[in-house]
Amino acid sequence: MDYLKQQNKRNRGLEVDEDEILATNKNVIVIGGGDTANDCVGTAIRQGAKNVYQLQRSSESERDSKGASFWGKISAMTKNPVFEEGGIREYSVKPTAFSGEAGIVNKLHAIKLDENREEIADSDFEIECDLALFALGFLHPEHETLLGDLGVELDERGNVKTDEFKRTSVKGVYAAGDMRSGQSLVCKAISDRKSVV
């Protein structure tokens, strides 16, 4: 994500060569609910954004009901320190459109969702938006590549299914990191390699 890459350059005292993306004095909307979205929220707050909103489709109850299989692994997000710095997290929201003038965005249009992720009638709303950041991650690794050619078994989320030693359903083929667990932190991927046998 260019926004975070640029800030990492600034943090190291390096020059940002491309057009700068800054949140200073802006109404910022971050779309997505994972670690990258949280990093965007924190960065925008620290850059002096006027307002920062994080929007995600999932509900708080949906997150809690998934258990350790997925949301349990990221339950720490509910008490994420970045939101102690500021920012507003909105659950069960579906962005529907952006609007603006002369090619410049100034509003996000959205609608609230029910527990089945269906739109709630007459729940449309707008948020002022000067900068929109999409931190949506990915659903699963691409299946139409080597994974498909090898015929490895996939789990219910479309990730490569493994046992506790990271062995796939194909003898001699192992999987670690995001392709096995879904999008996560690089340190977890590095840790995965230690249990490959």
Model region roles, listed by residue range:
Residues 34-38, 179-180:
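Residue-level detector of alpha-helix initiation sites
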Residues 1-25, 116-183:
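FAD-site-proximal beta/loop scaffold in flavoenzymes
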Residues 38-97:
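Rossmann-like dinucleotide-binding cores of NAD(P)H-dependent redox enzymes
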Residues 196-197:
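Conserved small/polar residues in nucleotide/adenosyl-binding loops
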Residues 23-34:
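Beta1/beta-strand and adjacent pyrophosphate-binding region of the FAD-binding site
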Residues 17-19, 81-88, 92-130:
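A structured beta-alpha segment of the ubiquitous adenosine-cofactor-binding alpha/beta core
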